[in-house]
């Protein structure tokens, strides 16, 4: 599997960050949102971002923009479709329905959710669709945070998951780890626990802020 073309759906902080980082890796990417104007504003934010999301700002126009009503046909040519919309399960399910009707056979579909279980996200997908569906949880800001969690489901083609992991490590420079579908995945699960331990110890020691 070769990833030569990516579509990111959702141009908020995470979606635009993912699109920018793909652009940094010279991977053709299209950023879609409800309206083209929203995607265009996201591209402007990428161009003006501090710290910069782009290594070379002259590449900004390599990020194509569009909307999910008029430009959804771009999905059919994508090797990887990343969903990065608001954390509402009903909206994500609607997006997946559109994606799986439009995508080419074998194209990877992933969600950037930070906490919704993959079992919930994929509950309306067929076993064949689940084979190509996973979670790719990037951390913010995408360019500077090294960790990437890839959460698999029980139907995944593990060879394809490993190829995606390799792409993200080699082409995107990420420290990619494959996780099971557990609450908080790995990063948030460990991070929240560490913060709670720190707060508990601070209370015990009667530390002030």
Spans of features found by a protein language model:
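Structural motif
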Residues: 9, 17, 66, 84, ...
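Amphipathic alpha-helical segments at domain termini/boundaries
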Residues: 19-26, 57-80, 165-173, 179-184
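Short beta-alpha connecting loops at secondary-structure transitions
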Residues: 31-36, 148-152, 182, 200
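Helical "substrate-binding/catalytic lid" subdomain
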Residues: 169, 180-209
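NAD(P)+-binding Rossmann beta1-loop-alpha1 motif at the extreme N-terminus of oxidoreductases
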Residues: 1-49, 102
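Rossmann-like NAD(P)-binding element
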Residues: 34-41, 52-109, 115-120, 148
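Rossmann-fold dinucleotide-binding core
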Residues: 107-189
